[in-house]
Design a protein with these regions (language model features):
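An N-terminal assembly and electron-transfer interface module characteristic of large anaerobic redox
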Residues: 1-761
Length: 761
C-alpha cells in the first residue's frame, strides 16, 4: 500500500469510491493471527481490524506479487508473507463476509496491460465495467509514474544536499511498511532528527543503474542493495537498516550489505513487538559515536576481497538442448573441462540419501566425477553455525555445513577443483540466495579451489541437457517411491531393523545398475521389488492410519531433518508419506504452463498458434506426458510390494483445492502446492497432516496460517513443526503425541492405549 498508494487512491477516486487508511493497530486483530508471523504481518492484522471497526464496506488487501524489475535478468517479487497477506487474513477473520474483501492481484511482470486485467477482475465484483476501470487505471497509473519521477528528483537533491552537510546524514533502509511507518519503526528516524542529523529514505535515491549481487528477485531487496551500493563511497552518508525478527529475506540481504560496505559502519536495528525504546536509543547513540570515530580514519584504504578466480560456465551448444560445461580461470584464462576430468569433483549436498545417491550415480554414468555427501549430523549444523550469523534458514546451513565438513576433512585435496552443486530459484523463497551467499562466504574463508555449480528451477533443472534431465527425472520419481516404501516398512514390518537392512541392500543394487549398467535398471528394480515383497509384515499399509508430511521441500526430504518425526510416528503404527520431490517438479511444470498460457494470450490472435510461447507450451506438455509415463512404469514395478500408500498426485486436481480453499495461482511457491496436496490427501482418506519447515520459514508459517483454520473447521488432525537442526524439544514431542492420538482416533478402530503409555515415558 505504501509503495503504490498514489495508484490505489487515484484509482478509487476516479471510480467515485471513498477510501481511507487504517490509523490504529487494534490488538484484537493482532490476536487473530493463526501463525507466528513477522512484526509487519502482526501489525497488518491489527490494521485490518481497525478498518473493520471504522465501518469499512470493503477492505482492499492486495496480493502484491511483483513490480517492474530494476534488473534485466530477474524479476522483482515480494516475500511470501507479503504476497499471501489476503489469503491468511481471510482465514484469520472467518466471521467477515467474503464479499467484503476486495481480491486484487498486483502484478506488473507482464506489463501494464496485464496488470489492468487484474484490476478489471476486482472491479467486476463491484459492478463496474471494463471501460470505466480502464480509464481510472490509466489516470491512476499516470499519477503513480509521476510520483516515482517526483521522488527521484527529491532523492537527487537530497543526495546533493547531504554531500554539503557538515554533520553525517543517515539513509534509512528496509521496507516502506517497516522503516517509514510509526506503528513499525518505533520512531527511529525521529531519534536521528532530534539529535540534529538529517534523514534520507532509501526509496527516493537515484540508484537505478547501480550494480548489485546477482539473482536478487525481491523488489525491496533490489532497492536496498542498490541504495547501499550508491552510498558505500559517500563520505557523509551512513546507513541504518530497519529489519524485523525472523525476516527471511534480510537474513541474506544483510550479508550482502556487509560485503558491500566493507569497513564502513552501518547500523542494523531488528524490531519486533517486544522491542524496548530505551534499547533502540542506546544503539542509535552508539552508532553515532562509531561514525565520529570512523570519519577520522576514513581515508584508509579497504583491503581487496579475496577471489580464487574460478568461474563455472555452462553454455548452450547452438539451438540444441546440450550444454558445454567448464571452469574458467579468469586469472590465467584457462578453461578447465568438467566432463571426463578426474581433477574436477562435483559435490552433491544430501537432500535424502536415496535421491542424492541416485543423482550421484547418474552424473558419474555420464562421465562426471561426482560425490554424494553423507547424511548430515549434529556436527554438520555446528560447523555451519560457526561460520554464519545463525539467522539463515536450516537448509542453507545444512548445505553449507556438509560442504565445510568435507573441506575441513582428510578427503579434501588442494590439487582438485570442487564444484558444489546448489539448485537455484528466482523467488519468492530464500533458496535462490544460497549460491550468492556461499560464493561470497567462500571468498571470506579464502577457499582456493571451490566453485559454485548452479541449475535453475525455472527450467525444471534441465540445463545439463536432455540426457541428464531424463535420468534425473527417473531418479526423482524412483526415489520418491522408494522413500514411500522405506517409511511404510518402519510402521508395518515385523522387524523394522531387519527390514531396513533388506531394503537398503536392494536399493544399493539399483544404484549400482544406474552407474554401471544403466540399461539394466528396470531389471534390477524388479529384483529389488521382489526382495522387498518378501519382508514379513505385522500389518498392511491400508489398515494403518496415514499421515502426509508437507511443507518446505528441503527439510521434509532431508533425512537428518525429518527422520525423528517419521520414526516417532512409525513406532505407533502410523504410516508416514513424505510429499515427494516429484510433486515439486510437477508444480514447477504447472507454473511454467500457466505462465506460457498467459504469454500466448498476449500474442496477436493471428500469430498465437505459431508463436514461441505456443511452441514452448507444446514442448512442455510432451515433457509432462513423458514424466507421467515414467512414474506409471516405476509404480507398476513397485506397487506389488503393497508398501506404497495411495496419494493424490495429479497436479491439476491438487491445484483445484489450492484455488478453492487457499490462494490464487499467482502465488508461486511451496505454499500453493503444499496446501492443496494436504487438502486433497485428507479428502482421499489420510488421517492427518504434518506441516514441517525450517525455523522462521516464510513458507511454513503461511501454510500454517492457511491450512490450520481450514483443517480445524473440518476436525482434521494438523501439526506444524519448525526444525532448527536440533532434536525435537519436549513441548513439540508433547504436541506430536497429542497429534498421534488424534490421528489414531480419526482413523477409527485404533488402540491408543499404548500411545498414551509411551507418551509418559
Amino acid at each position: 500500500v505504501h509503495t503504490l498508494y498514489p495508484l490505489y487512491s487515484w484509482f478509487f477516486y476516479e471510480l467515485g469510491i471513498k477510501t481511507f487508511l487504517s490509523t490504529e493497530v487494534a490488538h484484537e486483530g493482532v490476536a487473530r493471527a493463526e501463525a507466528q508471523y513477522c512484526f509487519p504481518a502482526e501489525i497488518a492484522h491489527g490494521a485490518i481490524q481497525d478498518c473493520l471497526d471504522k465501518g469499512a464496506d470493503y477492505v482492499l488487501m492486495p496480493h502484491f506479487r511483483d513490480m517492474p524489475s530494476y534488473e534485466d535478468k530477474v524479476h522483482a517479487n515480494f516475500c511470501p508473507i507479503t504476497q499471501a497477506l489476503p489469503y491468511y487474513m481471510e482465514k484469520a477473520f472467518p466471521d467477515i463476509e467474503a464479499k467484503r474483501w476486495l481480491p486484487l492481484v498486483v502484478s506488473f511482470k507482464f506489463g501494464e496491460g496485464k496488470a489492468l486485467e487484474l484490476f478489471c477482475e476486482m472491479t467486476s465484483l463491484l459492478g463496474i465495467g471494463e471501460a470505466e476501470t480502464r480509464t481510472a487505471f490509466n489516470k491512476a497509473w499516470a499519477k503513480q509514474k509521476a510520483y516515482f519521477e517526483a521522488v527521484e528528483k527529491m532523492g537527487i537533491q537530497a543526495l546533493a544536499d547531504a554531500r554539503k552537510e557538515k554533520r553525517p546524514v543517515i539513509a534509512v533502509l528496509g521496507r516502506p511498511y517497516n522503516a517509514f511507518t510509526p506503528e513499525a519503526n518505533m520512531g527511529i528516524p525521529r531519534k536521528f532528527t532530534t539529535r540534529g542529523y538529517s534523514i534520507i529514505p532509501f526509496d527516493i535515491l537515484p540508484f537505478r543503474d547501480e550494480v548489485i549481487f546477482p539473482n536478487m528477485y525481491w523488489y525491496y531487496g533490489q532497492q536496498d542493495l542498490k541504495a547501499a551500493n550508491l552510498l558505500k563511497n559517500e563520505d557523509n552518508i551512513y546507513l541504518t537498516f530497519i529489519t524485523n525478527f525472523s525476516c527471511a529475506p534480510d537474513s541474506f540481504i544483510l550479508h550482502y550489505i556487509k560485503w558491500m560496505m566493507g569497513q564502513k559502519p552501518f547500523l542494523v536495528l531488528e524490531l519486533d513487538s517486544h522491542s524496548a525504546d530505551a534499547g533502540v536509543d542506546t544503539r542509535v547513540e552508539a552508532f553515532l559515536d562509531i561514525i565520529d570515530g570512523y570519519r577520522t580514519k576514513k581515508n584508509e584504504i579497504d583491503a581487496e576481497r579475496y577471489d580464487n578466480g574460478y568461474r563455472f560456465v555452462s553454455e548452450r551448444v547452438g539451438d540444441s538442448d546440450e550444454f558445454n560445461m567448464y571452469i574458467n580461470n579468469v586469472k590465467t584464462k584457462e578453461k578447465i573441462p568438467v566432463k571426463d576430468n578426474k581433477r574436477v569433483k562435483i559435490l552433491l549436498s544430501n537432500m535424502g540419501n536415496i535421491s542424492t545417491q541416485y543423482i550421484g550415480a547418474v552424473i558419474r554414468s555420464l562421465g562426471y566425477n561426482a560425490q554424494a555427501m553423507p547424511v548430515a549430523t549434529n556436527k554438520t549444523i555446528q560447523i555451519a553455525r560457526a561460520n554464519t550469523s545463525g539467522k539463515e534458514c536450516v537448509p542453507s546451513q545444512l548445505v553449507l555445513g556438509s560442504a565445510l565438513e568435507f573441506f575441513f576433512s582428510d578427503e579434501y585435496r588442494k590439487d582438485e577443483l570442487y564444484l558444489l552443486f546448489v539448485p537455484i530459484t528466482t523467488g519468492p523463497c530464500r533458496t535462490g540466495q544460497y549460491y550468492v551467499y556461499y560464493e561470497n562466504l567462500f571468498r571470506d574463508l579464502r577457499l582456493e579451489n571451490v566453485v559454485i555449480f548452479i541449475l535453475s528451477a525455472d527450467n525444471s533443472y534441465t540445463e545439463l541437457g536432455p540426457s541428464f534431465a531424463k535420468q534425473m527425472w527417473i531418479g526423482v520419481a524412483l526415489s520418491d517411491y522408494l522413500k514411500d516404501i522405506q517409511c511404510s516398512l518402519l510402521a508395518t514390518a515385523e522387524d523394522p531393523v531387519q527390514a531396513e537392512k533388506v531394503f537398503e541392500h536392494s536399493w544399493r543394487h539399483v544404484m549400482n545398475a544406474v552407474e554401471h549398467k544403466p540399461k539394466g535398471l528396470w531389471k534390477e528394480l524388479k529384483i529389488a521389488a521382489s526382495e522387498i515383497k518378501k519382508i514379513p509384515l505385522k500389518r498392511s499399509v491400508n489398515s494403518c492410519p496415514r499421515v502426509l508430511i508437507v511443507g518446505e521441500i528441503y527439510v521434509r526430504r532431508d533425512d537428518f531433518a525429518v527422520n525423528e518425526l517419521i520414526e516417532l510416528m512409525s513406532a505407533r503404527g502410523i504410516v508416514v508419506k513424505v510429499a515427494g520431490v516429484g510433486e515439486w517438479i510437477h508444480y514447477l511444470d504447472f507454473v511454467r504452463e500457466y505462465a506460457l498460457k498467459k504469454l500466448v494470450r498476449l500474442q496477436k490472435p493471428g500469430k498465437r498458434l505459431f508463436s514461441k510461447p505456443s511452441r514452448d507450451l507444446k514442448k512442455l506438455q510432451i515433457e509432462e506426458w513423458w514424466k507421467h509415463h515414467i512414474e506409471k512404469k516405476i509404480l507398476s514395478i513397485l506397487n506389488p510390494t503393497g508398501l506404497i500408500p495411495e496419494t493424490p498426485h495429479d497436479m491439476r486436481h491438487i491445484m483445484k483445492y489450492t484455488v478453492e480453499h487457499f490462494v490464487n495461482l499467482e502465488l508461486n511457491s511451496e505454499i500453493a502446492v503444499s496446501s492443496g496436496s494436504a487438502a486433497a490427501a485428507m479428502d482421499a482418506g489420510y488421517s492427518g497432516i504434518v506441516n514441517i519447515s525450517p525455523f522462521a520459514c516464510l513458507i511454513g508459517r503461511v501454510i500454517e496460517g492457511l491450512f490450520t483454520p481450514w483443517a480445524r473447521e473440518r476436525n482434521y488432525p494438523i501439526l506444524s513443526v519448525e526444525i532448527d537442526g536440533n532434536l525435537l524439544p519436549p513441548n513439540i514431542v508433547n504436541k506430536l503425541n497429542i497429534f498421534m492420538v488424534n490421528v489414531l482416533r480419526f482413523k477409527g478402530g485404533q488402540d491408543v492405549s499404548t500411545l498414551v503409555d509411551k507418551a509418559g515415558e
